């Protein structure tokens, strides 16, 4: 999506990106918590779109560049919906919204093939505007109105759209801007920061009002910050589009950091650096709390070292702890005491962030007292890239600043 001739400008403050403030926005100077339910795809929440508002389940996705919603359109025909979709699919019916305006003539038709929504089938969308309603806010938002061009009648998706929270770079038009960013630029949100809490077990769910997580829009809760927040400038690299999330045209809007150190306990592991779009060398930490963010990020070599430490043996699991392409191993759970924490450092600070063994080891539910690693690898050999998601965030507060283009991390105070 982004010609290399202007890559140098991508990390100019996001406030300079093209976003036309609109008078069709309510002003709200507090934050709002999206209540998250964990699913096999990622975290889901209900959001209302249109006038009157149609409340639908959305996948909250740190790695998507806009507000995507399934509509009635099938091969451009709003009356042929179920020629493309399952009859149980929950959809946004744009024909019932008095504020829906199709703006495809202005922005152009959106089309990604391949993509990480439907993989080998194309993701196609018209561009439109409508009122997005979250809490007391209502913002006239540019959205991606899905226009299906393949048959997906076999089953319904458990959500109706994607609430994208990717960073916005200079030159990104509104069709690929996070709806939160559009709302902040329109004055609906006082703060450009969004934050995430993962309430991963029954002991922590009270913090999330009984839900599995909170995605806070417009700030963070200072009472849950233990110590200081460490802020890191993000980097831009096309390597993510090659090794991790493959789109054509390429998508490079990620909350990604330069990973400067990865160690297993005190054993430092080799880094395999790639070239970023400003010419620097970096191993990459990409933040993603959907299904691709499950599992502690490790290198292939690091995974081999963990296997050696506990004498693990290869195993085929019917219900693996994550959907990574790496193999899985089992070992005697008593050997978990031999495992050290995994440690990561990012450019801008020498602070090491840990994933302790109890958060990357899982007991197999087969009554054999066997355990497996919940880890995920990308690439070959040394550490080139890792996805930092819910496994990393179990005991941390993760924040994104849309104005400064920074990732903030703090220990979480329960």
Swiss-Prot record:
Residues 43-410 form the Peptidase A1 domain. CDD domains: pepsin_like (cd05471). SUPFAM superfamilies: Acid proteases (SSF50630). Disulfide bonds join 333-371. Disruption phenotype: Leads to the accumulation of pyranonigrin H. Keywords: Disulfide bond, Glycoprotein, Hydrolase, Signal. GO terms for biological process: proteolysis; secondary metabolic process. Residues 1-19 form the signal peptide. Glycans are attached at residues 93, 102, 140, 151, 173, 202, 221, 258, 272, 335, 366. Pfam families: Asp. InterPro entries: Aspartic_peptidase_A1, Pepsin-like_dom, PEPTIDASE_A1, Peptidase_aspartic_dom_sf. One of its GO terms (molecular function) is aspartic-type endopeptidase activity. Pathway: Secondary metabolite biosynthesis. Its EC number is 3.4.23.-. PANTHER family: BETA-SITE APP-CLEAVING ENZYME, ISOFORM A-RELATED. Aspartic protease-like protein; part of the gene cluster that mediates the biosynthesis of pyranonigrins, a family of antioxidative compounds. The first step of pyranonigrins biosynthesis is performed by the hybrid PKS-NRPS synthetase that condenses 6 malonyl-CoA units to an acetyl starter unit, to form a 1,3,5-trioxotetradecane-6,8-dienyl-ACP. The enoyl reductase (ER) domain of pynA is likely to be functional during the first two rounds of polyketide chain extension, to generate the saturated C-C bonds of the alkyl side chain. Belongs to the peptidase A1 family. This is Aspartic protease-like protein pynH.
């Amino acid at each position: 999506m982004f010609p290399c001739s202007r890559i140098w400008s991508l990390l100019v403050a996001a406030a300079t990106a093209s976003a036309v403030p609109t008078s069709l926005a309510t002003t709200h100077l507090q934050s709002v918590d999206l209540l998250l339910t964990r699913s096999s795809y990622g975290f889901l929440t209900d959001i209302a779109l249109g006038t009157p508002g149609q409340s639908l389940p959305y996948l909250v996705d740190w790695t998507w560049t806009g507000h995507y919603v399934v509509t009635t359109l099938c091969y451009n025909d709003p009356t042929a919906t179920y020629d493309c979709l399952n009859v149980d699919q929950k959809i946004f019916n744009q024909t019932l919204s008095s504020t829906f305006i199709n703006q495809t003539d202005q922005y152009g038709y959106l089309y990604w093939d391949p993509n990480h929504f439907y993989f080998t089938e194309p993701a196609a969308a018209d561009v439109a505007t409508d009122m997005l309603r979250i809490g007391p806010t209502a913002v006239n938002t540019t959205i991606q109105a899905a226009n299906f061009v393949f048959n997906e009648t076999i089953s319904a998706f458990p959500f109706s759209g994607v609430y994208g929270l990717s960073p916005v770079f200079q030159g990104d038009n509104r069709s690929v801007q996070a709806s939160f960013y559009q709302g902040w630029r329109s004055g609906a949100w006082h703060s450009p920061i969004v934050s995430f809490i993962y309430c991963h077990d029954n002991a922590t769910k009270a913090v999330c009002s009984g839900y599995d997580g909170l995605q806070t829009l417009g700030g963070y809760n200072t009472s849950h910050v233990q110590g200081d927040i460490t802020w890191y400038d993000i980097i831009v690299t096309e390597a993510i589009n090659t090794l991790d999330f493959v789109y054509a045209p390429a998508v490079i809007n990620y909350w990604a950091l330069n990973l400067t150190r990865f160690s297993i306990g005190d054993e430092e592991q080799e880094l395999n650096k790639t070239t970023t779009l400003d010419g620097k060398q970096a191993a990459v930490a990409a933040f993603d709390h959907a299904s691709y963010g499950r599992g502690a990020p490790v290198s292939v070599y690091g995974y081999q070292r963990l296997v050696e430490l506990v004498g693990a043996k290869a195993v085929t699991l019917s219900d693996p702890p994550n959907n990574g392409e790496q193999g899985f191993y089992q070992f005697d759970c008593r050997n978990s005491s031999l495992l050290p924490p995994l440690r990561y450092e990012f450019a801008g600070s020498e602070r090491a962030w840990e994933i302790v063994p109890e958060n990357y080891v899982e007991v197999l539910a087969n009554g054999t007292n066997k355990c497996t690693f919940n880890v995920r690898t990308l690439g070959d050999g040394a550490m080139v890239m890792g996805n930092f998601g819910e496994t990393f965030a179990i005991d941390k507060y993760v924040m994104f600043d849309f104005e400064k283009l920074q990732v903030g991390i703090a220990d979480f105070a329960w």
